[in-house]
């Protein structure tokens, strides 16, 4: 019993000491938790805030366009700033992350800092101005959140090249752009490469444009008639051996073999619209190369044979519309009827004009015009648009079919085509002047939206799908419709932007002053219309040649068109 009492007393002592030890430990932990930790930048603990931002004394959000070369950034805070923290927390950098020295001054008792680059920034450069969270107040507090301003500097308005007369400038643009088709033409086939990086991929419609460019070049004495005829002869010989599908060519071909290169999975056969654009060019060349010599006679004969072999009527599927594609592997799976309004009017004209495989007027009325559904009639930017979608769509709709077809005085039951194409171009011009999306650079000198290369690949640019990218071909291929407006654009593109977009094949495909982005690419389907339509503006050469073809006249009359040229 004594043993048990003694044991109990010992346990009480131990428990007492354990309890005291536990109280000590807990009290120690409590004291540690109450000790303030060092403040972390931007943690929100005892932080301070920025209260105002101005760029050149204006606040317009956190993105700016067209800034001068020494912009002033003023940032105001809720507390005075510790100046020693500024060098590591306030930064100006370019798009590569390279730091740019800035001059700092302080206002309002150090609660506002003003920063400006020490040296002038480059024109059309992308830059970032940052105030990071490691900036401190004089009370030792850190900024609660970072500030980032992205901006693009303004265009240098000075001329990049010596001034020329307008006629000299037009000569230069045509001659330089022609090099795409002449110097860069495929060495085996003579066909136009799809783009400047295309290798052996040649384009059917683009070659039609290239053939019309060759005619222009001969007429302008850029090359001799013999040289031009030889190149057309080379192209025709290649086409005679190339893959065809009921007479129609594929969109793309291998420039060595003539074999089809699929444009997409099921688009690996005949493309009727591309074929029509090719034939427009070939028939123009046939009218031009008409001398009584063996070479030019053979060119005319073989072009006629190629045209007559196209089974336009077969591409109706025995119905009342032409269809865009047919594939020997996928048959009619693409199932894309050719219906207006778009670039494909020439397809129906040449189909109706065919001496061997003609279509009826009902195919045109129902398939293309939708029995009148093609009409628009609405007004956009004070311009009445007879046909098509809202605001007209991309400008190539007003250009591709009218490289050969003269729209002036051309009318049918649905539209006056001279009005259609001029209104479409003027709508885009007026849109750029109004600039409802406030894209930097847009205006009377910088306009034109069409399908082209884009910042993120390729895009069909138009008023309803505008991301600030301008394509020179849009305004310059509108020369016959808007000569004064197109000349303004040409002067601007060449003199003010020439250091960015002028190269060995003329103007590059697209640019955006708003995003300080400039394509380095050139495409056959964009280079060709510029040469051709500038020539139609200057002399109507291609219009006169194409419209002089008797089969074209017959086809137009068959579809119900009237024109002083038929």
Which sequence ranges carry the predicted segments?
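N-terminal secretory signal peptides that target proteins for export/translocation
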Residues: 1-13
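Structured core of small recognition/catalytic domains
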Residues: 14, 38-41, 108-111, 208-219
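Sec-dependent signal peptide recognition
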Residues: 15-20
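C-terminal motif of bacterial Sec signal peptides marking the signal peptidase cleavage site
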Residues: 25-28
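Acidic, low-complexity Ser/Thr/Gly/Pro-rich repeat segments typical of extracellular/periplasmic
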Residues: 33-158
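Ser/Thr/Asn(+Pro)-rich, low-complexity disordered segments
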Residues: 156-566
